[in-house]
C-alpha cells in the first residue's frame, strides 16, 4: 500500500540522516544509497563503530522492526517492493490494527504511536 511505501522511504531518508547523509544533497536515489553505504562502512570500521550503529538502530526504532541499518540500505538500493523493510512495516501495521481490534480500544496503538512520534518513524494512517 501507499502508506507502506511512504513509511519505507521515510525510514530510508531518516536512516541516511542518522548516518550523516542527507537525501536532498543527492540527485538520485542510487547516489544517496551509495553515500549511505560509504558512511555505514566508515562508521563500522571505527573502534566502537558497531556499538554506535546499534545505538542508531534503536534510535530509529529499527530494533522493534527486527531490522538492521544494513537491511534498510539494501532495501533502498534494491527497489524491490517485497523486501525485508516492506515486510517488517507491513507486519507492524497489521499488528497495530490487530491489537486495536483485539482490545477494542486504541490504547495499544496510542502507546505505539507515542513511541513512533518519539522516533518520528511511522505515521498510522
Residue ranges and their predicted role:
Residues 1-125:
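Type III/flagellar secretion export determinants
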